[in-house]
Amino acid sequence: MPRDKQKRGRRAEAKRKRDDVITDPTVLKRQKSSDVCNYPNPSYEQLEIRGDYIPLDEEPVDYTGTPFYGLLDIEEQEYFSHASGLLELNQFETEEEKSIFIERVYEEANGKELKIACSQSCSRLMEKLISASTVSQIKRLFSKFIGHFLNLVQHRFASHCCECLFIHAAQHVTSEMKKKSSKEKENLEEDSTSELQLEDLFLKAISELEGNWGYLLTERFASHTIRLLLLVLAGKPLRNSSTTTVIASRKKEYLASKVGTQLDPSISEKRAVPTSFNKALEKMMKDLVAGLDNTYLRALATHPVGNPVLQLLLSVELSHMGKSKAKDPDSLLRRLVPDENLQGDGESANFLKGLFYDPVGSRLLETIVQDAPGKFFRLFYKILVRERIGSFSRNEIAGHVVVRILERLSKDDLKSAMDMILPEVAPLVERSRLTVIKALIERGIVRGVDLGPLAAALLSAYGDDAVSRINNMLKLQRSNQESDGTTSSSNTSSPEQLHGSLLAQAMLKSTGPLSELVQSSLLAVTTETLISIAQDPVVSHVLQDALTLPTSTPQFRRQITSRFSGKIAELALHSSGSHVVDALWPATKDLLFVKQRFAEELVVHERALRDSFVGRAVWRNWSMDLYKRKRGSWIAIAKGLEDSTDINPNALTHKPKSNIDLARARFAAKANGSKAPS
């Protein structure tokens, strides 16, 4: 078959043509030349400008707004990742060995602190280091961050490092303040950067953020840091159930426990702060809302990021600066609610009514209800809530605000509120919205309100049958179905089951018909159901409270404890059931024969109990070693003749000191310069 005629050397000729077009080989390289516009904007970096090119009328883009601190190389990443794993394992033999390791990591990280803080893989190491650092190390790291806080608090990973640094530095501000007042000097080797007090370092960090509060207020990451700084300056608890959800999300992971570091108890308590902090707090709060009008402030009330900051601002203003601050026309509360009379169709009243049903704004309304002055709260309740509290309690979102309102009502107002809510009990039970009912019971116990009508309403809602009543309240059928499946019930417990368990626990605290509703139901179920309740991690708390609370009568305890005969060993080896076995000890304080029967069951299964972690705890709590060796002493404890704190056999038998103990005491006394014991 004939072939097409082709010219030899066509590829070489095409290559020569390309070489003729580009005569300068340096143009191919990524280098800036004098013929090209020297702008950082890539649109200006062109290898060739054609004749038909028309330049755009735009300014060069400035890329220097967010600094880039560089990346860790592969070896550094491997080293710091390995160090992070060692800190999390926390398998150091001594604290000294751990402190030496931490200091070596700090030496390796010297000059790379900002890179580590901004690294996705190594920022967690920085948090762990801060959690285990000494005061001088915290000061040293704090001073390295000075000058960069405005950028760090807006960074996805570095912002967490800043929060961790502020939390652990705040623990030592009070102690430094006391030492400064008593003119004591630390005998520590500190470099020039750690000569600054933490008070001064905090003030420097805040000064860096000044002028940017309005933007940072709603910034995704920086807003968390602002909330934390408000708590630090105000001296409010930093790790508290009431503040944790405002500072961080529910997914926030605290690494201090993972590295075996115990936080100062003062972190969960109100702290004394320097006078300069109070001045900085007032200035910071004023600057945060200075450029915002009232309309924008109200818009922040429903903003997912700005709302928590607004909550803290309002809480600090009313609790830290005094209730009289609310009378100031420039106060945050008056700017949000300027109308003092709360007229029905007024702007302030409509704003507060809208917050009831908003999933974000209702949290701000809870803060207002909790911290507002009494005069404002009484007016708010009288005009906006009292006649509508029943309809508010029906709503899933407004119900949380109703709970806060019930906490502040007097006895008479609480009784009238309960009368308004009683018709809504049945629909609330049907929808498993039990928080308002639980709050009614708890506040009724505190205020001394008769809860008989509420018990009758609950009996009507759950039914007269005791077995179906406890099944509906604790959602036992769903729990049994989940336990029969592949997924354990501990991982799939529903919110309805949790709320039902909390309601039952609240009912057990009330003397009278409410506690009898739960107790009669527990007595009516079968033994298998009772054991399944004891082994459920959520509803087992109901059984524990039923056995130990003062509302538990001797007749009820005698009937319920006998149901566990033959099941004690099985429960003692279960993670949740073991707590029920522990509760059976005080429940049988006047039932010695029942307690001895349970002890015999534990002795029979001694080997299995000793091989189990929870089993060993039950063995120790029941003082079974004493039961085997000194039965008389054990019976004395079981009858309550001995102090319940002396259950430990070592505390019961006061043995004379051995020779080695005496030698240790003499050595310790000699080291302290005191007289040796005889």
UniProtKB/Swiss-Prot annotation:
Source species: Paracoccidioides brasiliensis (strain Pb18)
GO molecular function, one term: RNA binding
Gene3D superfamilies according to UniProt: Leucine-rich Repeat Variant (1.25.10.10)
Stretches the record annotates as Disordered: 1-24, 477-496
SUPFAM superfamilies with a match to the protein in the record: ARM repeat
Protein function: RNA-binding nucleolar protein required for pre-rRNA processing. Involved in production of 18S rRNA and assembly of small ribosomal subunit.
Basic residues composition bias: residue spans: 1-15
GO cellular component entries: 90S preribosome; nucleolus; preribosome, small subunit precursor
Gene designation per UniProt: NOP9
Protein keywords: Nucleus, Repeat, Ribosome biogenesis, rRNA processing
PANTHER family (alphabetical): NUCLEOLAR PROTEIN 9
Cellular location(s): Nucleus, Nucleolus
Segments annotated as Pumilio repeats: 108-143, 291-334, 382-419, 524-562, 563-600
Presence of keyword Oxidoreductase: no
Taxonomy of the source species: Eukaryota, Fungi, Dikarya, Ascomycota, Pezizomycotina
Origin: domain of life: Eukaryota
Protein name, UniProt field: Nucleolar protein 9
GO biological process: endonucleolytic cleavage in 5'-ETS of tricistronic rRNA transcript (SSU-rRNA, 5.8S rRNA, LSU-rRNA); endonucleolytic cleavage in ITS1 to separate SSU-rRNA from 5.8S rRNA and LSU-rRNA from tricistronic rRNA transcript (SSU-rRNA, 5.8S rRNA, LSU-rRNA); endonucleolytic cleavage to generate mature 5'-end of SSU-rRNA from (SSU-rRNA, 5.8S rRNA, LSU-rRNA); ribosomal small subunit export from nucleus
